[in-house]
């Protein structure tokens, strides 16, 4: 197969080639994962970047995303307005203490008001004064140019806005905004020199072609960071009874994304615990980044299990990306 060697020599794989490889049952998933690992090791060694999410505003949303427990169609959900600055700042301290490189501040809704952007901006300034090396990622929805400039000025390093699925499959997932709304948001951030983060949710009924199209769309978008979420079905949502993933399929997807985006940060995100299950460690053979702790409205596994997983693989936390470098040689003692 020698895919990694070909890619390192400059070959650009086509969609047709990647789809054929992905669907070829004669190509063992672990062999494909090994090709991805060659690329991951070449560009990132054995380092793992750690990320943490804070749900700063929950359940107040007019959108009808079929995967989301915060959508307008869900009656029973956790709802609260944008939390006080102090709580967000406290979350940054927790991130620092847990060797987190990127702290992600997330808000529900179509997009933030100007008042909410000012609130986030003021908070980020305070966090940066206390933890200057902690990277801040904002995920606030659709924004305008003035809001993007405020976030940049405040010190926001990265902005997340996932494409979630392929352009072709988009309207099966959500109809209250367009695929272009999402890609335009990422382009706006790039225009304001904010690092673009955009990823996907797999397991919503998309085809193999859709999976390939997603990976190539993110390559064309030149997203710096690509979170791969695996659907964690939530009762009451459109995809609440979906069961389309196996651990091996998840690994195959992650390997495919690494082959197409060899130099990018690829993050294993929501749903990894319930979908990868005992094979979670193998995902880090292709991915070089994970979320630790809880997600927006679903729980994650205890941080210590993630530290142990990294250690057991012979990998290490990417201390170059985090401010807290204590316990550098023994993450098992981390809190």
Swiss-Prot record:
List of residues binding [4Fe-4S] cluster: 61, 65, 68
SUPFAM superfamilies the record matches: Radical SAM enzymes
Pathway: Cofactor biosynthesis; biotin biosynthesis; biotin from 7,8-diaminononanoate: step 2/2
Catalytic reaction(s) noted: (4R,5S)-dethiobiotin + (sulfur carrier)-SH + 2 reduced [2Fe-2S]-[ferredoxin] + 2 S-adenosyl-L-methionine = (sulfur carrier)-H + biotin + 2 5'-deoxyadenosine + 2 L-methionine + 2 oxidized [2Fe-2S]-[ferredoxin]
Domain of life: Bacteria
CDD domains listed in its UniProt record: Radical_SAM
InterPro entries (UniProt xref): Aldolase_TIM, BATS_dom, Biotin_synth/BioAB, Biotin_synthase, Elp3/MiaA/NifB-like_rSAM, rSAM
The enzyme's E.C. designation: 2.8.1.6
Chain ranges of the Radical SAM core domain: 43-269
Gene Ontology biological process terms from the UniProt entry: biotin biosynthetic process
UniProt keywords, alphabetically: 2Fe-2S, 4Fe-4S, Biotin biosynthesis, Iron, Iron-sulfur, Metal-binding, S-adenosyl-L-methionine, Transferase
GO molecular function, one term: 4 iron, 4 sulfur cluster binding
Family matches, as SMART domains: BATS (SM00876), Elp3 (SM00729)
Record Pfam families: BATS, Radical_SAM
Cofactor note: Binds 1 [4Fe-4S] cluster. The cluster is coordinated with 3 cysteines and an exchangeable S-adenosyl-L-methionine.
UniProt cross-references to Gene3D superfamilies, sorted A to Z: Aldolase class I
Cofactor requirements of the protein: [4Fe-4S] cluster; [2Fe-2S] cluster
UniProt: [2Fe-2S] cluster binding residues: 104, 137, 197, 267
Family named by the database record: Belongs to the radical SAM superfamily. Biotin synthase family.
Complex and partners: Homodimer.
Protein function: Catalyzes the conversion of dethiobiotin (DTB) to biotin by the insertion of a sulfur atom into dethiobiotin via a radical-based mechanism.
Identification of the protein by name: Biotin synthase
Organism for this UniProt entry: Staphylococcus aureus (strain JH9)
């Amino acid at each position: 197969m020698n895919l990694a060697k070909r890619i390192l020599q400059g070959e650009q794989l086509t969609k047709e080639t990647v789809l054929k490889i992905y669907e070829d049952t004669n190509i063992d998933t672990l062999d494909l994962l090994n090709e991805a690992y060659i690329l991951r090791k070449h560009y990132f060694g054995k380092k793992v970047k750690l990320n943490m999410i804070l749900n700063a505003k929950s359940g107040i949303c007019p959108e009808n995303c079929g995967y989301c427990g915060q959508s307008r169609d869900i009656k029973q959900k956790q709802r609260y307005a944008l939390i006080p600055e102090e709580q967000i700042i406290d979350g940054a301290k927790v991130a620092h203490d847990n060797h987190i490189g990127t702290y992600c501040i997330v808000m529900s809704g179509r997009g933030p008001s100007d008042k909410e952007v000012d609130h986030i901006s003021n908070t980020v300034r305070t966090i940066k004064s206390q933890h200057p090396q902690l990277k801040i990622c904002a995920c606030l929805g659709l924004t305008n140019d003035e809001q993007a400039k405020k976030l940049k000025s405040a010190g926001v390093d990265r902005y997340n806005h996932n494409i979630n699925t392929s352009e072709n499959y988009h309207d099966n997932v959500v109809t209250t905004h367009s695929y272009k709304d999402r890609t335009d948001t990422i382009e706006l951030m790039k225009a304001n020199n904010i690092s673009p983060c955009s990823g996907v949710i797999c397991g919503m009924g998309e085809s193999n072609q859709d999976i390939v199209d997603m990976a190539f769309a993110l390559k064309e978008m030149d997203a710096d960071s690509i979170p791969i979420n695996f659907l964690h079905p939530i009762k009451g949502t459109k995809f609440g009874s979906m069961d389309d993933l196996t651990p091996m399929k998840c690994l195959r997807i992650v390997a495919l994304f690494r082959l197409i985006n060899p130099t990018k940060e690829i993050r294993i995100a929501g749903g990894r615990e319930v979908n990868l299950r005992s094979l979670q460690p193998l995902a880090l053979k292709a991915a070089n980044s994970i979320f630790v702790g809880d997600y927006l409205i679903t729980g994650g596994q205890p941080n210590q299990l993630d530290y142990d997983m990294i250690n057991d693989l012979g990998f290490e936390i990417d201390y170059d990306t985090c401010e807290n470098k204590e316990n550098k040689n023994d993450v098992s003692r981390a809190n």
